[in-house]
A protein has these predicted regions:
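Structured, active/binding-site neighborhoods that engage oxygen-rich ligands
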Residues: 1-274
Length: 274
């Protein structure tokens, strides 16, 4: 809401574009606060709060907006899970579980736990009792088959497996994203640069199984990267490649990632102190 109401505070040079970008959050944010939305007159706040960011299916929004939550609760996966779940008020369905599990995994990875141990721990994590009479929560109930099938796969073979095995999931599906993050981190936690290459080489396949286009690969890389950072540390990527990415974003998009990150951190600290 703050970004939508005060776009000049976020990107002073692009207030209109900023407001437009954050408009997808306006409806659900007003609804969560129990208020009517100026963009959706006549729709009750309870409905606005349940419609996510305007899509009626689970998405990766929470994992993209909260990729840092687990770092706040090192060694405390249950607390990381609960806080991420609470904060992702805009997620619906198992998207909130996926967001919470990513946070829990980070909280363990950042204290030095190995990927296999982290995965085993989160498979038994349900502090909010999301499971019921019919079994475990969706994400942790569905993960084991993928973990077993891909146990020996790495590199190109893993990328191909993930593209094919997850092809029936929407490209924005949170389960698809967390499967990629976990399997890639397990296979290549010793080589985060290769891990990111596997994460970004994911295809959206047609009905006959042939590649149509890349899936939502930048988002998969961001989500996977947030977990790899916990496993490997911020200085584990090749400096030359980091500089290349920073410069490419400056040249192509006129975005300085380092300045934007600092502005975001400063804004969070400011809002936290208000």
């Amino acid at each position: 809401m703050f970004c939508w109401e005060h776009p000049k505070r976020i990107f002073p040079q692009y207030p209109d574009l900023t407001r437009q970008q954050f408009s997808i959050w306006e409806g659900v944010s007003h609804g969560f606060l129990g208020k009517m939305s100026p963009s959706f007159p006549g729709i009750a706040p309870t409905i606005l709060a349940s419609r996510s960011i305007g899509l009626n299916y689970p998405t990766i929004a929470g994992m993209l907006v909260l990729p840092f939550m687990g770092f706040f609760y090192p060694g405390n996966p249950e607390e990381a899970y609960v806080r991420a779940y609470e904060t992702a008020f805009f997620d619906i369905g198992y998207a909130r579980e996926a967001t919470a599990l990513l946070s829990a995994a980070q909280s363990l990875a950042v204290i030095g736990c190995e990927p296999d141990f982290v995965i085993e721990e989160i498979l038994n994590l349900d502090p909010l009792s999301l499971g019921g009479s019919f079994g475990k929560p969706y994400v942790i109930a569905s993960l084991p088959d993928f973990l077993l099938d891909a146990k020996s796969l790495t590199g190109v073979d893993l990328a191909k497996y993930l593209s094919k095995r997850l092809s029936h999931y929407n490209v924005f599906d949170p389960f698809r994203a967390i499967v990629i993050a976990l399997l890639v981190s397990r296979a290549h936690s010793d080589d985060p640069w290769l891990a990111l290459q596997v994460a970004v080489n994911q295809w959206d396949l047609g009905q006959n199984g042939s590649p149509r286009r890349f899936a939502d690969v930048d988002c998969y890389a961001s989500i996977t990267g947030s977990l790899l950072g916990a496993f490997c540390g911020s200085g584990s990527l090749p400096l030359q490649q980091v500089e290349k990415v920073l410069e490419s974003n400056r040249q192509v998009y006129n975005i300085d990632i380092e300045i934007t990150a600092k502005r975001f951190i400063d804004l969070i600290l400011q809002l936290s102190s208000d």
